C-alpha cells in the first residue's frame, strides 16, 4: 500500500550516549531513518542527547532537539511540537523503553500521537519475558525450559527443579545488563539480585542453560502487507553462552545444511508475523549440533547491532527501508538503493564471507574480568570481507588495531595444555588465539571441540591457517607459497617475520611478481544484476571491479573500531571531511572497517573500501587509485600512526606535514618549539630508563604525571604521589626503552581549559574555548566540559587566545588542532597540543554553527580561512550555556575501578544546554543517567588530603536538607565544624555497615576520594563498585560534587529561621 498521507510530522527517538551494548550503530540507523522519512516528504523531529553524532546535525532532521531522553523532557517536546506519530524502533533499547514509558504515562494519548513501525503490544510481547514465552508456546516454537521470577525464593524453586547451570536474562535491558550464567548458589544469589535491580520491571527469566548449541541469527524484515524476507543470516563462531555482541560472527552462516537453514528461516518468519512487526527485527536461535532440535532464544523487535552488521555485510540498508515500511510502504514498492533496479523484496545473496570480531576495552582496564558470558563487554567491533573464511578472519584480526597482524599472540606461547584447556572452556577475549595456539602445539580438533563445542568446520579453518604457517616457514622465498598464503589472508607483516625480511621488501617482491589483490564490489545480489554501489573489498582473484576514474581523488582514513578514547566523534569528523572533499570537486574515497558507523555507509563517499587500516591494506588501495594525497587528521590516533609509513611509501600527507605532526607529538621537539614561542608549560622531562625516571621525579618534586609518548585516551597515564608508586608504574604499566620514552611532568592542580582551533598556516580561527569542571589530572574525555567558560577572566581568555594563535602558526598547523591548557596561580600553561580532530569537534561545531571538520578539510585542500569567510581570532560566544557530560559503562565491567584520573574511562557523552549553568548541568547530568533527588542522604568518605575541602561541601549538603552519613574519621572532622552527621560502620565491620546502606538504596550520593592504591581490594574500590552495582551516583572528584551541589541548590528553596538571618546581619554591622 502507498505511504500514509494522514500523518505529516514524525518524532524520531535517538539512542542517547554510547555505552557498552549500544554503540555507533544507532547513529547509523537513526541518520538513515531521518533521511529516508524526509525523502518521503514528512517533517522529521529528532530528539537525542548525544552531540557526537551525525544524527544530531541540524541538516539530518527538520528540527533537532539535543535533550535528555527522559520522560520529563521528551513529553515536553511532544507537547510543544505535537507530532502525529513517533518512531522509536531505531533508537535501540533506549528508544523502545522510552516508547513504553511515554505510552504508560498517558502523554501519547493526551496529544494524539501514534507509535509507528512496531506496535506497543509487539514491543512488550518481545521484550517482556513472560509474554514472549507464552507467544512461543502458542506458536509451538520451542524455548529452553524456563521460569519468570521476581525474587530470589522463586529462583531457588526453579533451580531445585532443573539443576545448574542456569541463564539469567533480565527483562527490558540492554546488552544482557545484569544477567549471566550461574553454575552454583553463590553465583545465583549475585546474578539474580543484580538482574532484578537492572530490570525496570523487576523481572528476570531463568532458563536451563543450552550453552554449547550453535547460535544462529536471522535478520528479517516485514511490511504491513505481510511480505517478509530474510536479509541476512549469521552464525556465531562461539556457541551459545557468549553474548552475541561479544561473539565472533560470520555471515552467511557456514555450517548449516539446507534443511537446517530453511527450518530456522521459516521459524524466524513465523515469529515476525506473529508479533506483527513492521520493519526490521532480529531473531536469535540455538541449534543442537547433533539433531534438528532448536530453541528460540530471543527477539529484538527493532533495528539492532546485528542489523547494522547485516546492512554492511549485504549492502542492504535495513534502517532506511524500516523507516519507509513504518510509514506504510511495502517491500514490493521500495526500490533497492543498491542495484536501483530490483525491489526491496528480493532477498540478498552473498558471494563472499564476512567476519565480525568485537573490540574489547581490556587493554584499558587491566583489572577487568575478561571472561565472556551473557553480559556484553565489547565497546565496538570490526568487520572484514574475504572470498574464504580464513582470509576474512585474518583481515578482521588485523583490523582490531591491537598491534596484531596474525592469529597469534606472543604471550600465549608459554601456556601449557591445562591452562589452555581452562581458558578455552571458560571463553575470554583471546579464545580464538588460544585455539590456534593449541592446534600449533598439537592438540586435536576433537579435544578442542570437547572443551568448548566450537564447530569442527571453524576448527578446521583455524587448522588450515596453522598448516599454512608451517608451509610459509618451510619455503622461504617461494612465490607459489606466497601466493597461496596471500589468498588465505596472510599479512606481509607475518610473512616478513617468517622470512626474515622487512614488510616493505615483501610488498615490493609481490609488486614485481604482479601478486596484488583485486577489489570486488558488494552488490547484494551475488553479481546477478548490475550494481550502482561503489562499495569494495580486496581479495586475491582475477578480475578487478573497482574502476579508477580520471577525476582527482582524495583518500580519508577512518578511525576503525569504537573503543574507549576513540569514539564516534572521530567518525563524525570523517564523514564531514568526506562531504567537504565532494563539495570541493574531488572524488572522496574512504577506508574504514567499522560496520556500525555512518562513514561506512556506501552512500556517503564516492568510493568506500571496507579494509583493515594497516599500511599494507591502505597501500593496495593507494597503488590502484593514485590519489592526490591522504588526509589523516580525522581518524584519531589510528590514522596519525600510519602517516610516517605512508610518507615512506611516497604518499602525500595532506594538511599538517609529517614533520610538524612529529613536532607536536615528540616531547623534546615540542618543548623546544614552546620555548622558542615563549609559551610556558609545566616542568617536565623524558626518561628512557627506570633510574632516570626516579631522578627526574626527585628533581621536579612529587606529585608527577607520568605517561608514554604518542598515546590516545590517556592510555597508561597516571598521577604518582611517591617513589614506590612510580616504580610500580614503571614496572607494570609501560615497557620503557629508548624508542618508547616515558614523559614525566610536574602535576599542577589547576583549572583545565580545552581549545579547538583551525589553522591554515597564516590565520588561526578559534570556534570555542571550553572549561573543565574537574581540575587538571582528570582526563579531558572524562571531565564535564562547559562552554562558554564561566570563571575565566578576560585577561586569562586573551592569554589563551594569544597562545593558541601562536601555536597554530608556530607549529605550521594546516587543519585542526586541539590544545589543553591548565590555569595555575593566574598563569596559563600548555599541557599538550594535538594536531588533529579531537573529541570535542562535534560538540563545538553544533553549538557555534562553525562546521569545523568541513572548514578544516577545505583548508587542507588549499582554500584558506579568509576565502571561507573566517579570519584570525575568537568566534563570538553564544548566550546559552552548554555542558558536555561523560557517560560510563561501569555496570557492564565488573572489577573495574570507577575513580576518575588521567586515563580515560568513559564510553560516550551527552549534552545539556540551557540559559544558566545550573540548568544546563542538570540536563547534562540527568541525560548521563545520574539521578538528582532534591533530598535524601549522602555518604562522605574522603582521603585526609581532601578533608578540608570536603567540609565546605558537607555544609552545603546539610543546608539544603540532606542527611550526612560518614565513617568515624570523617565524622569527627564534621562534628568539629558543628555539622550534624550520622556515624556509620566501616565496611569491614560485621554489623550493619556502609555497604549495606548502599545496597538498600538508603543513600542518594556517595562521595569517595579514598587513598590511591591500584589493588582492587582497597576499601574505596569496594565502596565505589557497590555504588555502581546498585545504581547510586558515586562521585570521586570533589569538583563534580560541587557541580551537582550547584544544581541541587538551584532546585531547592532555602529555609532559614528568622533568628539565623538576623544574627548574620548583626555580625555584618559589627565588622563594618
UniProtKB/Swiss-Prot annotation:
The record's annotation in Pfam families points to: CPSase_L_D2, CPSase_L_D3, MGS
CDD domains, alphabetically?
MGS_CPS_II
Give an example GO cellular component term for this record: cytoplasm
Residue positions binding ATP 1: 129, 169, 175-176, 208, 210, 215, 241-243, 284, 298
SMART domains, alphabetized: CPSase_L_D3 (SM01096), GARS_A (SM01209), MGS (SM00851)
Entry-linked SUPFAM superfamilies: Carbamoyl phosphate synthetase, large subunit connection domain (SSF48108), Glutathione synthetase ATP-binding domain-like (SSF56059), Methylglyoxal synthase-like (SSF52335), PreATP-grasp domain (SSF52440)
The UniProt record lists the ATP-grasp domain at: 133-327, 671-861
Pathway participation:
Amino-acid biosynthesis; L-arginine biosynthesis; carbamoyl phosphate from bicarbonate: step 1/1; Pyrimidine metabolism; UMP biosynthesis via de novo pathway; (S)-dihydroorotate from bicarbonate: step 1/3
Q: What is its EC number?
A: 6.3.4.16, 6.3.5.5
Which positions in this protein are listed as binding Mn(2+) 3?
A: 820, 832
Q: Where does Mg(2+) 1 bind?
A: 284, 298
Task: Identify the stretch(es) annotated as Carboxyphosphate synthetic domain.
Answer: 1-401
Name the keywords, alphabetized. Amino-acid biosynthesis, Arginine biosynthesis, ATP-binding, Ligase, Magnesium, Manganese, Metal-binding, Nucleotide-binding, Pyrimidine biosynthesis, Repeat
Region called Allosteric domain, residue ranges: 930-1072
Region (Oligomerization domain) residue ranges read: 402-546
List positions binding Mn(2+) 1. 284, 298
User: Any idea which positions bind ATP 2?
Assistant: 707, 746, 752, 777-780, 820, 832
Q: Which residues bind Mg(2+) 3?
A: 820, 832
Region annotation (Carbamoyl phosphate synthetic domain) maps to 547-929
Which residues participate in Mn(2+) 4 binding? Answer: 832, 834
Family note:
Belongs to the CarB family.
NCBIfam families, per the entry: CPSaseII_lrg, PRK05294.1, PRK12815.1
What is this protein for, i.e. what is its function? Large subunit of the glutamine-dependent carbamoyl phosphate synthetase (CPSase). CPSase catalyzes the formation of carbamoyl phosphate from the ammonia moiety of glutamine, carbonate, and phosphate donated by ATP, constituting the first step of 2 biosynthetic pathways, one leading to arginine and/or urea and the other to pyrimidine nucleotides.
UniProt remark on domains: The large subunit is composed of 2 ATP-grasp domains that are involved in binding the 2 ATP molecules needed for carbamoyl phosphate synthesis. The N-terminal ATP-grasp domain (referred to as the carboxyphosphate synthetic component) catalyzes the ATP-dependent phosphorylation of hydrogencarbonate to carboxyphosphate and the subsequent nucleophilic attack by ammonia to form a carbamate intermediate.
Protein name per UniProt? Carbamoyl phosphate synthase large chain
Q: To which species is this protein native?
A: Bacillus cereus (strain ATCC 14579 / DSM 31 / CCUG 7414 / JCM 2152 / NBRC 15305 / NCIMB 9373 / NCTC 2599 / NRRL B-3711)
Q: Which gene encodes it?
A: carB
Amino acid at each position: 500500500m502507498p505511504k500514509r498521507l494522514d500523518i505529516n510530522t514524525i518524532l524520531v527517538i535517538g539512542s542517547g550516549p554510547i555505552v557498552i551494548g549500544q554503540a555507533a550503530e544507532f547513529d547509523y540507523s537513526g541518520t538513515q531513518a531521518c533521511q529516508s522519512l524526509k525523502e518521503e516528504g514528512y517533517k522529521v523531529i529528532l530528539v537525542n542527547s548525544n552531540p557526537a553524532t551525525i544524527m544530531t546535525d541540524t541538516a539530518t532532521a527538520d528540527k533537532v532537539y539535543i535533550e535528555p531522553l527522559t520522560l520529563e523532557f521528551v513529553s515536553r517536546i511532544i507537547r510543544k511540537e505535537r507530532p502525529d506519530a513517533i518512531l522509536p524502533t531505531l533508537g535501540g533499547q533506549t528508544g523502545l523503553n522510552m516508547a513504553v514509558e511515554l505510552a504508560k504515562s498517558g502523554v501519547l494519548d493526551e496529544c494524539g500521537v501514534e507509535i509507528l513501525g512496531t506496535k506497543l503490544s509487539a514491543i512488550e510481547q518481545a521484550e517482556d519475558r513472560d509474554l514472549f514465552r507464552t507467544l512461543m508456546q502458542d506458536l509451538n516454537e520451542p524455548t529452553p525450559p524456563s521460569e519468570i521470577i521476581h525474587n530470589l525464593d522463586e529462583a531457588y524453586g526453579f533451580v531445585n527443579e532443573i539443576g545448574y547451570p542456569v541463564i539469567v536474562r533480565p527483562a527490558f535491558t540492554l546488552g544482557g545488563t545484569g544477567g549471566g550464567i550461574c553454575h552454583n548458589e553463590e553465583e545465583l544469589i549475585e546474578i539474580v539480585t543484580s538482574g532484578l535491580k537492572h530490570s525496570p520491571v523487576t523481572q528476570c527469566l531463568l532458563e536451563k542453560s543450552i550453552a554449547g548449541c550453535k547460535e544462529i541469527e536471522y535478520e528479517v524484515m516485514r511490511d504491513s502487507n505481510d511480505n517478509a524476507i530474510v536479509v541476512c543470516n549469521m552464525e556465531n563462531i562461539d556457541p551459545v553462552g557468549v553474548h552475541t555482541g561479544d561473539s565472533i560472527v560470520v555471515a552467511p552462516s557456514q555450517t548449516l545444511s539446507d534443511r537446517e537453514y530453511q527450518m530456522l528461516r521459516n521459524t524466524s518468519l513465523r515469529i515476525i508475523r506473529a508479533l506483527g512487526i513492521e520493519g526490521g527485527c532480529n531473531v536469535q536461535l540455538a541449534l543442537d549440533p547433533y539433531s534438528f532440535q532448536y530453541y528460540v532464544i530471543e527477539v529484538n523487535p527493532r533495528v539492532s547491532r546485528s542489523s547494522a552488521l547485516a546492512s554492511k555485510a549485504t549492502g542492504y540498508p535495513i534502517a532506511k527501508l524500516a523507516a519507509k515500511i513504518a510509514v506504510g510502504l511495502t517491500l514490493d514498492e521500495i526500490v533497492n538503493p543498491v542495484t536501483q533496479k530490483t525491489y526491496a523484496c528480493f532477498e540478498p545473496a552473498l558471494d563472499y564471507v564476512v567476519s565480525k570480531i568485537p573490540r574489547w576495552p581490556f587493554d584499558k582496564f587491566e583489572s577487568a574480568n575478561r571472561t565472556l558470558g551473557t553480559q556484553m563487554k565489547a565497546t565496538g567491533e570490526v568487520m572484514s570481507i574475504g572470498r574464504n573464511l580464513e582470509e576474512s578472519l585474518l583481515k578482521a584480526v588485523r583490523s582490531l588495531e591491537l598491534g596484531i597482524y596474525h592469529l597469534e599472540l606472543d604471550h600465549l606461547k608459554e601456556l601449557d595444555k591445562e591452562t589452555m584447556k581452562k581458558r578455552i572452556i571458560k571463553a575470554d577475549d583471546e579464545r580464538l588465539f588460544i585455539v590456534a595456539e593449541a592446534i600449533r602445539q598439537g592438540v586435536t580438533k576433537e579435544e578442542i571441540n570437547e572443551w568448548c563445542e566450537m564447530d569442527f568446520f571453524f576448527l578446521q579453518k583455524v587448522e588450515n591457517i596453522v598448516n599454512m604457517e608451517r608451509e610459509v616457514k618451510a619455503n622461504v622465498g617461494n612465490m607459489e607459497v606466497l601466493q597461496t598464503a596471500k589468498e588465505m589472508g596472510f599479512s606481509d607483516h607475518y610473512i616478513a617475520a617468517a622470512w626474515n625480511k622487512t614488510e616493505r621488501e615483501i610488498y615490493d617482491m609481490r609488486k614485481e611478481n604482479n601478486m596484488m589483490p583485486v577489489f570486488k564490489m558488494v552488490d547484494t545480489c551475488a553479481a546477478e544484476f548490475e550494481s550502482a554501489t561503489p562499495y569494495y573489498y580486496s581479495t586475491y582473484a582475477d578480475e578487478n571491479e573497482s574502476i579508477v576514474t580520471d577525476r582527482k581523488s582524495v583518500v580519508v582514513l577512518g578511525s576503525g573500531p569504537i573503543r574507549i578514547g576513540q569514539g564516534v566523534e572521530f567518525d563524525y569528523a570523517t564523514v564531514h571531511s568526506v562531504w567537504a572533499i565532494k563539495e570541493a570537486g574531488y572524488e572522496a574515497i574512504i577506508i574504514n572497517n567499522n560496520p556500525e558507523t555512518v562513514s561506512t555507509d556506501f552512500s556517503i563517499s564516492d568510493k568506500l573500501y571496507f579494509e583493515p587500516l594497516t599500511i599494507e591494506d591502505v597501500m593496495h588501495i593507494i597503488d590502484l587509485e593514485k590519489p592526490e594525497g591522504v588526509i589523516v587528521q580525522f581518524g584519531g590516533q589510528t590514522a596519525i600512526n600510519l602517516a610516517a609509513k605512508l610518507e615512506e611509501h611516497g604518499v602525500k600527507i595532506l594538511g599538517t606535514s609529517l614533520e610538524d605532526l612529529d613536532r607536536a607529538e615528540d616531547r623534546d621537539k615540542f618543548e623546544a618549539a614552546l620555548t622558542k614561542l615563549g609559551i610556558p608549560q609545566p616542568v617536565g622531562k623524558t626518561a628512557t630508563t627506570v633510574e632516570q625516571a626516579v631522578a627526574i621525579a626527585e628533581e621536579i618534586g612529587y606529585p608527577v604525571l607520568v605517561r608514554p609518548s604518542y598515546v590516545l585516551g590517556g592510555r597508561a597515564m597516571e598521577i604518582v604521589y611517591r617513589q614506590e608508586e612510580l616504580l610500580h608504574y614503571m614496572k607494570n604499566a609501560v615497557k620503557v626503552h629508548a624508542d618508547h620514552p616515558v614523559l614525566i611532568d610536574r602535576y599542577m592542580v589547576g583549572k583545565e581549559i580545552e581549545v579547538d582551533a583551525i589553522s591554515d598556516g597564516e590565520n588561526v580561527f578559534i570556534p570555542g574555548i571550553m572549561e573543565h569542571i574537574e581540575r587538571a589530572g582528570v582526563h579531558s574525555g572524562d571531565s564535564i566540559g562547559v562552554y562558554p567558560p564561566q570563571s575565566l577572566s578576560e585577561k586569562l581568555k586573551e592569554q589563551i587566545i594569544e597562545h593558541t594563535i601562536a601555536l597554530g602558526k608556530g607549529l605550521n598547523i594546516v587543519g585542526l588542532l586541539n590544545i589543553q591548557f591548565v590555569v595555575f596561580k593566574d598563569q596559563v600553561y600548555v599541557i599538550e597540543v594535538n594536531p588533529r580532530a579531537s573529541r570535542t569537534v562535534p560538540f563545538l561545531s553544533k553549538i557555534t554553527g562553525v562546521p569545523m571538520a568541513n572548514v578544516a578539510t577545505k583548508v587542507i585542500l588549499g582554500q584558506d580561512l579568509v576565502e571561507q569567510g573566517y579570519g584570525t581570532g575568537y568566534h563570538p560566544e553564544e548566550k546559552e550555556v552548554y555542558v558536555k557530560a561523560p557517560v560510563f559503562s561501569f555496570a557492564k565491567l565488573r572489577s573495574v575501578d570507577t575513580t576518575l584520573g588521567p586515563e580515560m574511562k568513559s564510553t560516550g557523552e551527552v549534552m545539556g544546554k540551557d540559559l544558566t549553568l545550573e540548568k544546563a548541568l542538570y540536563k547534562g547530568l540527568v541525560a548521563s543517567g545520574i539521578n538528582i533527588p532534591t533530598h535524601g542522604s549522602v555518604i562522605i568518605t574522603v582521603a585526609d588530603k581532601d578533608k578540608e575541602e570536603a567540609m565546605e561541601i558537607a555544609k552545603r549538603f546539610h543546608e539544603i536538607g540532606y542527611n550526612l552519613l560518614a565513617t568515624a574519621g570523617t565524622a569527627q572532622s564534621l562534628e568539629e565544624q558543628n555539622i550534624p552527621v550520622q556515624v556509620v560502620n566501616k565496611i569491614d565491620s560485621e554489623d550493619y555497615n556502609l555497604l549495606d546502606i548502599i545496597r538498600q538504596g538508603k543513600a542518594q550520593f556517595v562521595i569517595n576520594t579514598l587513598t590511591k592504591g591500584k589493588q582492587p581490594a582497597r576499601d574505596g574500590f569496594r565502596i565505589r563498585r557497590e555504588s555502581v552495582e546498585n545504581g547510586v551516583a558515586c562521585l570521586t572528584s570533589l569538583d563534580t560534587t560541587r557541580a551537582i551541589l550547584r544544581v541541587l541548590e538551584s532546585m531547592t528553596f532555602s529555609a532559614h529561621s528568622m533568628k539565623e538571618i538576623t544574627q548574620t546581619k548583626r555580625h555584618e554591622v559589627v565588622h563594618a
